[in-house]
A protein has these predicted regions:
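A generic tandem-repeat structural signature
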Residues: 27, 35-52
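Alpha-helical protein-protein interaction modules
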Residues: 9, 17, 24-28, 40, ...
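Non-membrane alpha-helical segments in proteins
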Residues: 1-12, 46
Length: 203
């Protein structure tokens, strides 16, 4: 967890592969001591998802969920994996439950991340109206949310240039490497990934 935070906040000079290898090694050691440690399975699920190993991400997410089915962090992590692997209804059920149980996650000051997870889920469900509805509950946009919301607006034939997301895109993210950014969305379907990348690069 600490290694992941260091990487995403820019506090580590190690490259991504080194950090993930070290994180996995540490978690594996912890699992050797206690194979029923749900935190280890939860974190391994996240590590495998980041490496696009969706089978193992789902496997460890399920193990954590079976141990503590009402932990919001487990619900959120496992739900994120399921919506990506085609089990959208179940994934959304878990993401909505995480939001209901713990709308503002520990250590955070808003419900943005929970809502962004729901945006991801409803995007995969192709419920574009719900994606746009949720967009108004996000206070700080990130590249993933911008791409998913703008894509959803386009599917609803809305004027993109009038949206908050378009303005943030042009002011804060105009230099974004979208190939790299979309890869970090960890989308299993190559068709969906390509369509989204083509769309956002053309906006």
């Amino acid at each position: 967890c600490t290694l992941g935070q260091a990487m995403f906040r820019g506090f580590s000079d190690q490259n991504t592969e080194e950090i993930f290898a070290e994180a996995k090694e540490n978690i594996d050691k912890a699992l050797e001591l206690n194979e029923n440690d749900f935190e280890c399975h939860r974190m391994l699920s996240a590590v495998y998802l980041s490496n696009h190993d969706y089978v193992l991400a789902e496997d460890h997410g399920k193990k954590a969920f079976n141990m503590v089915p009402n932990d919001p962090r487990v619900l959120s992590g496992y739900g994120e994996v399921l919506v990506r692997t085609g089990k959208v209804d179940k994934g959304l059920e878990l993401l909505n439950k995480a939001y209901e149980l713990d709308p503002i996650p520990q250590g955070q000051s808003s419900s943005d991340n929970r809502v962004k997870d729901l945006v991801l889920g409803y995007f995969f469900a192709e419920d574009y109206n719900k994606v746009v509805e949720l967009s108004f509950d996000i206070s700080v946009m990130d590249p993933r949310s911008i791409a998913l919301i703008l894509y959803s607006r386009s599917q609803l034939k809305q004027d993109l240039e009038m949206s908050k997301e378009y303005k943030v895109l042009k002011s804060d993210y105009k230099e974004t490497d979208w190939t790299q950014a979309v890869d970090r969305f960890h989308i299993q379907s190559e068709d969906i990934r390509k369509n989204l990348l083509e769309f956002i690069e053309g906006v």
